[in-house]
């Protein structure tokens, strides 16, 4: 059953009908559509637009549809234009003409806006749950490796020694901010658009605040035109998903590097690796590569919706139907990535001796030599220059800083004493950095 057609003299072409239909993808809004319709009917009964008996029968019909969809007895199929048409058609088939009163005081414009807010809100809560699982894995990893030393990098060159706990603490902070962004977005999206109608409200005495409260919203939206014509809450959510994807991708990039033969910092579980069809020795980090690759897909969905919305005049335009496929794809993709990342990380092993030996190379304790000289009374800028000369000397001699003799050190500064060797050991370099947020603050 079509929800329109009275002013048309010809049937819509079959190709155009297929082009216009959204049921194949918006059918996943079925539960939200029913939830919104039930709240709408309760309100219509309360304000007297429907009698108590009418409201009760319609609610029973909607509850029956929900139950049958959940059990699989009713399948979402057929030639309905969208999920709203499908639900209303089934309702009319089941309870007769009374079902035609369901849509009183409502447009599909505010109906779909409501469905999407309900769906996105629920998906955001689920996403936070998967983030929490990943954070729990990271926190467990940090506790286990508080004193396990690894090289820290800038410009992909060894810079200073740090710990595994400190390194992953950076990702913990990123994902905590991601969680905070989701919570903030949920607050902004948590307003009910139902009752906005096509864009200009309705002449029926609707109680929009009742519906908002019934559905767990903070309140009803303030402007009926804005309610149906913007998708900023959805764009913001896709941005949040893109930000999470970016953080996941950065972590995956490091996992891919660390897993390579040249780094050899970690061992990935066989459960989260794949092989080669031609090279029998290969053990590839495909899960990490896929998460990294899917980030571009999530970004693309965000920019697709931004581009769709950028030129639309107020109020509703059918272009906005394009919001769903990109949104659903990003939601599904990101949740999948979070689940895989948590399990992959939880099963990953660190090659601790390899990490420690790597941290010794590349003069990563050079800053600590400079700090040592400063504590002996040398200005930092002078110390910086002296240590630069020391590093150049080491490169020519094929030595590391801790391999220099005291006599060699004193060629560059008379301030150097025997205690230099304790000051520049890996443990000292890490645990003496105790300022808030530094690796030494996690050592004890």
Model-inferred region functions:
Residues 37, 84, 88, 234-237, ...:
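Short runs of predominantly hydrophobic/aromatic residues within well-ordered alpha helices
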């Amino acid at each position: 059953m079509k929800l329109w057609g009275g002013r048309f003299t010809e049937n819509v072409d079959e190709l155009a009908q297929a082009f216009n239909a959204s049921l194949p993808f918006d059918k996943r809004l079925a539960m939200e559509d029913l939830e919104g319709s039930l709240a709408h009917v309760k309100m219509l009964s309360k304000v007297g637009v429907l009698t108590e008996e009418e409201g009760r029968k319609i609610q029973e019909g909607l509850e029956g549809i929900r139950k049958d969809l959940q059990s699989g007895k009713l399948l979402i199929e057929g030639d309905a234009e969208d999920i709203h048409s499908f639900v209303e058609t089934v309702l009319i088939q089941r309870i007769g003409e009374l079902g035609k009163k369901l849509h009183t005081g409502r447009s599909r414009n505010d109906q779909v806006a409501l469905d999407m807010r309900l769906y996105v809100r629920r998906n955001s809560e689920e996403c936070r749950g998967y983030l929490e699982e990943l954070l729990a894995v990271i926190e467990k990893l940090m506790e286990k490796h508080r004193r396990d030393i690894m090289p820290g990098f800038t410009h992909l060159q060894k810079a200073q020694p740090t710990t595994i706990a400190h390194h992953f603490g950076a990702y913990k902070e990123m994902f905590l901010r991601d969680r905070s962004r989701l919570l903030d977005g949920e607050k902004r999206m948590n307003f009910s658009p139902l009752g906005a109608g096509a864009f200009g409200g309705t002449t029926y005495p609707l109680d929009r605040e009742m519906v908002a409260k019934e559905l767990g919203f903070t309140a009803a939206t303030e402007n009926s035109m804005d309610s149906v014509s913007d998708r900023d809450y959805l764009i913001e959510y896709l941005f949040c998903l893109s930000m999470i994807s970016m953080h996941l991708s950065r972590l995956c990039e490091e996992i891919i590097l660390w897993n390579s033969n040249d780094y050899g910092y970690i061992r990935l579980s066989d459960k989260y690796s794949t092989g080669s069809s031609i090279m029998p020795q290969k053990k590839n980090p495909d899960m990490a590569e896929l998460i990294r690759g899917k980030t571009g897909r999530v970004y693309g969905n965000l920019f697709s919706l931004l581009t769709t919305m950028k030129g639309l005049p107020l109020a509703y335009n059918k272009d906005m139907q394009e919001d769903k496929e990109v949104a659903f794809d990003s939601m599904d993709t990101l949740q999948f990535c979070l689940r895989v990342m948590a399990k992959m990380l939880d099963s990953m092993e660190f090659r601790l001796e390899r990490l420690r030996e790597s941290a010794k190379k590349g003069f990563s304790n050079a800053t600590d030599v400079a700090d040592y000289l400063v504590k002996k009374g040398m200005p930092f800028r002078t110390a910086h220059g002296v240590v630069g000369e020391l590093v150049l000397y080491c490169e020519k001699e094929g030595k590391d800083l801790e391999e220099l003799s005291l006599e060699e050190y004193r060629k560059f500064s008379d301030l150097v004493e025997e205690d230099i060797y304790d000051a520049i050991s890996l443990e000292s370099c890490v645990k003496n950095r105790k300022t808030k947020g530094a690796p030494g603050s996690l050592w004890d």
